[in-house]
């Protein structure tokens, strides 16, 4: 599968992925995006469990979770890590929102976040830290292609408020 780009004001591509987390959202160990219609959804992609930037971002969403829930917003974190890794990550940091396992990167490619990266002089393919804000009708209302991990949840909340979602 090749990378596509999901843009604002387009329908969010549907998917089903294995997940851990809230029984309100995770059904039979999976999350199906289209089943969340009627809820504003924050779909955030991150490179790897329990790494500094990803931990800062996850903890920012954890800290904003009460405010998100008050607004009826569902937060979904997605990485290529497996369910066992997600379980350890969620337990270690007290994450209350679902973490989805895109182990074959199909959904990361579908959303255009599987990209060439450079680190320490090496080039490799990996998940880019990006977020998609999806409205109650399944339309992408905002895309964040660059994220400041520790401040991101607050930025998302402000956007939800400004868009009246």
Residue ranges of predicted features:
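Chalcogenol-based redox active-site neighborhoods
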Residues: 1-165
